[in-house]
């Protein structure tokens, strides 16, 4: 039994780089596109007098909580998580984005999706435990890494701005 567990763990660890960086980042891009980018386009269309009703649609689509949720849901979906994990990631992404922007949502979603997947389908009370675990782990990760990530991204932006002025 120990050998099988060790092999399963090694297989899982070997798959993490593709799962987190290829699948996770490409899915994150889809979530950003489906919310922030499209929301911005809709908002711009709302600047036309005849289409002013679109402004509110765009504003909602590009709201930080909606963008965070879209990022996190897209990541969980791209990682082939079970439905309860995917849907629970909405709260994780909103929280992660609030704490650490898009990178905060990304990292919180990765940990939440993995944690939710570990227990999904293993209990009789999945309907309670899967969302609880997914949201709890994701929000804890988001709260720990959010502020440092936000500070780092601000610093990186300042460095890039300074470099472009040289």
Give the role of each language-model region.
Residues 2-166:
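Signature of multi-pass transmembrane helix bundles
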């Amino acid at each position: 039994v120990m050998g099988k567990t060790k092999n399963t763990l090694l297989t899982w660890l070997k798959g993490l780089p593709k799962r987190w960086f290829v699948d996770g980042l490409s899915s994150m891009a889809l979530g950003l596109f489906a919310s922030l980018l499209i929301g911005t386009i809709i908002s711009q269309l709302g600047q036309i007098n005849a289409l002013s009703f679109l402004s509110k649609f765009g504003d909602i689509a590009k709201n930080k909580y909606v963008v965070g949720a879209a990022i996190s849901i897209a990541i969980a979906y791209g990682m082939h998580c079970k439905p309860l994990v995917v849907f629970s990631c909405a709260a994780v992404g909103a929280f992660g984005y609030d704490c650490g922007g898009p990178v905060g949502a990304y990292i919180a979603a990765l940990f939440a999706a993995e944690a939710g997947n570990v227990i999904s389908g293993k209990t009789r009370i999945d309907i309670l435990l899967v969302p609880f675990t997914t949201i709890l782990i994701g929000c804890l990760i988001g709260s720990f890494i959010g502020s440092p990530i936000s500070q780092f991204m601000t610093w990186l932006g300042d460095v890039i701005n300074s470099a472009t002025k040289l």
